[in-house]
């Protein structure tokens, strides 16, 4: 049953838009015996978990409101990466971490008629893994999930800044890269970029002096020049010279 339900989720999601994921994830959860299944996505500052709801859905109860990361079982599941359970009237609610690689996205909230046994928990864990993969894959194709992660307005400079950033966390058996930008709604100028390839990991930090649109433009231009040089196979010194030349002639 689990494999069939997950295969159906993968098939249905192939041509799905970001706003359709909520319904698909819930449908898969029902096929696995859940009453409701809701993905919660963390905001940029990782303070709250916001529910991903189908278009037009209303907050039917407090469980579908934003959840505090530091004060709820859902938040504990997010922080510890371990499933959590709580008894509720007429059933049980399980919280499972949504993780893609090492990127923590949020949690999966699952309402069940009875406490899950080991097999059921294993099935829900597989659903959480599939949901996390879909969230990462579908986010760039719409604003639904992007808006969900924002609790404040991003100005032009910050929007430009975020558009050039790679994923802020990555890990393999050989290397781990992690970064955070603050104040996250007013970033403009500080940029990280990295590349993990066979036998080599390259990490670069850039600081566009000042703070504002001009600083963000400078940082974005610098990253583009850096990637162009790096992907052309230049040495570290030649990359530096190439980026410097691009800045002198291009800005």
Region roles according to the model:
Residues 116-136, 221-224:
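Amphipathic alpha-helical "output/dimerization" segments
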Residues 84-100, 106-108:
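A short, aliphatic-rich beta-strand micro-motif
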Residues 13, 21-82:
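Structured interaction and signal-relay segments at domain junctions
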Residues 145-251:
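… and, occasionally, acidic/histidine-rich disordered N-termini of signaling adaptors
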Residues 1-15, 137:
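Signal-transmission linkers at sensory-effector interfaces
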Residues 134, 138-145:
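Amphipathic coiled-coil signal-coupling helices
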Residues 106-116, 208-209:
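Short beta-strand-to-loop transition segments that serve as allosteric relay/switch motifs
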């Amino acid at each position: 049953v689990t494999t069939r339900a997950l295969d159906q989720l993968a098939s249905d999601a192939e041509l799905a838009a970001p706003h359709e994921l909520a319904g698909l994830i819930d449908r898969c959860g029902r096929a696995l015996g859940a009453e409701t299944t809701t993905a919660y996505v963390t905001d940029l500052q990782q303070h709250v978990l916001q529910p991903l709801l189908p278009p037009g859905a209303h907050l039917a109860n407090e469980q579908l409101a934003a959840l505090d990361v530091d004060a709820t079982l859902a938040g504990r599941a997010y922080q510890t990466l371990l499933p959590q359970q709580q008894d509720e009237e007429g059933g049980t609610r399980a919280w499972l971490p949504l993780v893609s690689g090492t990127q923590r996205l949020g949690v999966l909230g699952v309402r069940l008629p009875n406490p899950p046994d080991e097999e059921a928990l294993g099935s829900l864990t597989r659903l959480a893994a599939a949901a996390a993969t879909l969230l990462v894959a579908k986010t760039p194709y719409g604003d639904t999930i992007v808006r969900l992660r924002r609790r404040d307005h991003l100005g032009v400079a910050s929007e430009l800044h975020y558009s050039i950033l790679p994923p802020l966390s990555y890990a393999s058996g050989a290397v781990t890269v992690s970064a955070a930008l603050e104040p996250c709604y007013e970033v403009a100028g500080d940029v990280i970029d990295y590349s993990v390839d066979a036998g080599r990991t390259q990490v670069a930090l850039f600081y566009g002096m000042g703070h504002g649109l001009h600083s963000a433009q400078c940082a974005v231009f610098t990253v583009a020049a850096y990637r162009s040089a790096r992907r052309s196979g230049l040495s570290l010194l030649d990359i530096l010279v190439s980026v410097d030349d691009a800045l002198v002639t291009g800005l």
